[in-house]
Amino acid sequence: MAKKSLKILVDEMDDGMDEKLEKIGFEAYSVKKLRAEGLKLHTDFSVINYAKKNNMILITRDTESGEACDENTIPCILLDTNEIFKIVLDKLRQF
């Protein structure tokens, strides 16, 4: 069940996930869309800092961003390539 109190920031590599999360009740924002609105989110540091200042959970594929979040106790979901690979393998086994 979605928790509307969670605020989520989706890194630019997964732009569009914010819209899917919003449809199921999450408050989600896209780095790409926020940048288009004029926010200066051009570096990993600025993205992480924005998430921290706004009490957001960052969703990213960027390993360095994920590690920086961990080091600074900022909530983050790292979409690790190994996890994605496991999903691909599971799907391939269905054929």
Regions picked out by a protein language model, each given a short descriptive name:
Residues 55-71:
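Acidic, metal-binding active-site segment of PIN/NYN-like and related structure-specific nucleases
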Residues 8-12, 57-60:
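Short, hydrophobic beta-strand segments that form beta-sheet elements in well-ordered domains
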Residues 4, 41, 60-62:
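Short secondary-structure boundary micro-motifs
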